Amino acid sequence: MSKWSDIKMYDLTIPIGICTPAWPTYEPLQMKFFKRLTPNGANGQLMTHSNHVGTHLDGPMHFDTAGRDVASLELTKLCAPGVVVDLSDQAEDFGIYTPQDIERRVTVKEGDVLIINTGYHIYGWDSPTADERRYMLRHPGPSLDFIQWVRDKKIRWIGVDCGSADHPMNTKIRDWEPMEATACDKLFQKKYGKTLNEVY
């Protein structure tokens, strides 16, 4: 790896505040002052939120009882060369992207970090075009063969500009939001000739 002075850094975080949406059914962020300049001489705030608010990294323990938490991940595993792929021109509500879509646009090397620009950051809560339902419930997501491709490539981690790195209809959102699932099912039948259950 190059010297740090040779590396350009990017801040990819979405601003966090009381309006930042949490993962559906999760506790949203709450903030309150417990000290003020007057009379305490300093401001102090208490902030509570669930682990799925704003920009974050899921540790292996999120899906695996024996998995490690984020604090135990080595920073050297998180800092690595990477590539950004722009899929925003093909992005649509409930869209599906594949490993082939990515490899047609960029070269992904073994061990890379992969950042996927779906274009759905424009629906983030802090954007003039904010649309929480599109950002969290209708964003594009990967095909089922994507996970094996990620494993084969030994991708270090994946970043996305929307509510989840997974397709929303390949998560519990499908059960929690039946009207969204019905809309997705209709789209899949029209576009792919398959039902939602056949795709995911």
Each model region followed by its residue ranges:
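Active-/binding-site microenvironments in catalytic and ligand-binding cores
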Residues: M1-Y200
